[in-house]
């Protein structure tokens, strides 16, 4: 499709983000409830990414592993990769885990193997020891650690838990089902947040050649944390944090969520400041036409 589009509508656009969201089809089959807070919460997680001020691409894992051009992003976010074959795990290790990249893993990334669920396999995949007793519980993350990755991150994280709060005013729904809890139990990892009982809910670890960020709570990658990760990884950050932004090398679209001045840091190194009004959408031409 990309090749057909390029032939029919050549743009000369050479801009590409430094961040890539990794997705895999068929992952909902491994979630017990057909309309769970994990699955529905992915919509809210996407909203957090879109308002982070960090441009990103999104590709299926199969496309990334088949195309060398998709294997040199600075940051990869594994968003819904519950089931991974041994072949896929090996390919990810060989192609993505190196070159000083940052890999971010959400919740149950890599938990399901060809022989069933495995906390050991998840631990090996994310690069730090993760445990689970298989139970389901209220599991928000409290960001209570001062760290470069937690700067400006609100103290309560977990969009699935947020969704449960919206859906539990009365009656029962599969939306009210709590997710399986994953805890980090790795002395070599640096904690970024905890569960209510003090267990580590999110952490980071430098693995010598690449850095892992693991968030045990589903859909808990806040926009501010993504922005911090991008800056630490040397990835491009547009700015306009808190507003919804999308961009190419030709234009930026910005949907304002609040009124006031907004500064965009453009790919050519210049800055552009706009006075925006809440709920209005703006298009910024980057080619000077």
Which role fits each region the language model picked out?
Residues 1-72, 115, 128, 199, ...:
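Aromatic-Pro/Gly-enriched surface loop or interdomain linker
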Residues 79-289:
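A conserved amphipathic helix/loop scaffold
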Residues 75:
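Short, Asp-centered acidic motifs that coordinate Mg2+ and/or phosphate
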């Amino acid at each position: 499709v990309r090749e057909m589009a390029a032939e029919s509508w050549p743009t000369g656009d050479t801009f590409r983000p430094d961040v890539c969201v990794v997705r895999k089809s068929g992952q909902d089959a491994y979630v017990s409830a057909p309309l769970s807070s994990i699955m529905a919460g992915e919509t809210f997680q996407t909203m957090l990414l879109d308002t982070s001020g960090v441009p990103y691409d999104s590709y299926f894992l199969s496309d990334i592993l088949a195309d060398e051009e998709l294997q040199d992003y600075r940051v990869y976010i594994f968003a819904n990769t519950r089931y991974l074959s041994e072949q896929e795990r090996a390919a990810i290790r060989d192609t993505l885990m190196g070159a000083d990249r940052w890999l971010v893993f959400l919740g149950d990334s890599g938990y399901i193997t060809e022989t069933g669920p495995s906390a050991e396999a998840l631990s090996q995949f994310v690069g730090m020891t993760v445990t689970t007793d298989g139970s389901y519980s209220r599991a928000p993350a409290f960001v209570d650690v001062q760290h470069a990755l937690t700067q400006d991150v609100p103290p309560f994280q977990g969009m699935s838990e947020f969704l449960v709060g919206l859906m539990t005013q009365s009656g029962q729904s599969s939306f009210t089902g709590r997710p399986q809890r994953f805890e980090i139990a790795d002395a070599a990892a640096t904690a970024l947040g905890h569960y209510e009982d003090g267990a580590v809910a999110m952490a980071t670890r430098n693995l010598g050649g690449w850095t892992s960020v693991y968030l045990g709570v589903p859909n808990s990658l806040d926009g501010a944390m993504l922005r911090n990760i991008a800056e630490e990884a040397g990835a491009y950050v547009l700015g306009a944090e808190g507003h919804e932004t999308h961009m190419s090398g030709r234009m930026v679209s910005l949907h304002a969520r609040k009124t006031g001045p907004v500064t965009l840091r453009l790919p050519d190194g210049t800055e552009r400041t706009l006075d925006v009004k809440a709920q209005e959408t703006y298009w910024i031409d980057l080619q000077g036409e």
